[in-house]
Amino acid sequence: MTSSSIVLYEFFDFLKKERRVSVHTTRSYKSDLDQMITYMSDHYEEDDLCNMKSEWIRSWVVELMKLNKAPRSIHRKISSYRTFTKYARRKGLMDGNPVEGVVLPKLEKRLPNVVPEHAMSSLFEDNLFEDSWNGRRDKAIISLFYETGIRLSELIALRLQDLDGQRQTLKVFGKGSKERQMPLLQDTISLIQTHIKERPFNASTLFITDRGKSLYSSFVYRKVNYYLREVSTLQKCSPHVLRHTFATHLLNRGAELAAVKELLGHSSLASTQIYTHNTTEKLKEMHKASPLDRRNK
């Protein structure tokens, strides 16, 4: 194993153990960095990411654009390398930051998909969940996503000790292993506790599959997709849609943007501001019903 391979191995180990990123995210990092190494090796006979130069990154970005890669995909690839450089500089393996000053293609503004409030209400009121331990598990999972806005990776990582029934809180470890305490409704806590008592398997994790194994991304995605399609016409029905829905519905009901930022675990308020557009659009729709608007009709 070469020295550069050892550094990458240690980096991925750091992502898994210290930043607690999901398997899916780790694979994305590996794919992005492998592509970067291949390009460097083919064009500059260099396979050590610590020796990257800014002009090489610019050249790679141009190449990706020629291949008609989406701007969002290019941004993600460079973001993967940026995360690696932060790790490498902290370890004393790099001095400068070759990403600095590199201009990336402009991102198109993409509004988050959101499930309407009436659709979410019908999901919980129309008895769509089976009357069984795994039916209650599914309902608890959907409830947690909608009530807390947690990420898929955060839900999968939840353990029994993270739930505090007395304080009605849930301990969540977000990006960078940042811990936050999420308030929970008593109904949700009771649902989770009932599901745990009824399930026929012993496990240290809060949720398990039908076979008693730890949750994995595609399992949760399929469950969320199934239930949301029962009440929604959205083309994309994923756990992240429920995160968008949580944030938008809170803001629609008058929550402060800063409070929503903390609940979502965002490090920057700018990341949360995208949800304000959805609430603005709703206000515009409501304003169409204004009596003053009828003067011109």
Regions found by a protein language model. Name each.
Residues M1-K297:
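Conserved catalytic core of the tyrosine transesterase superfamily
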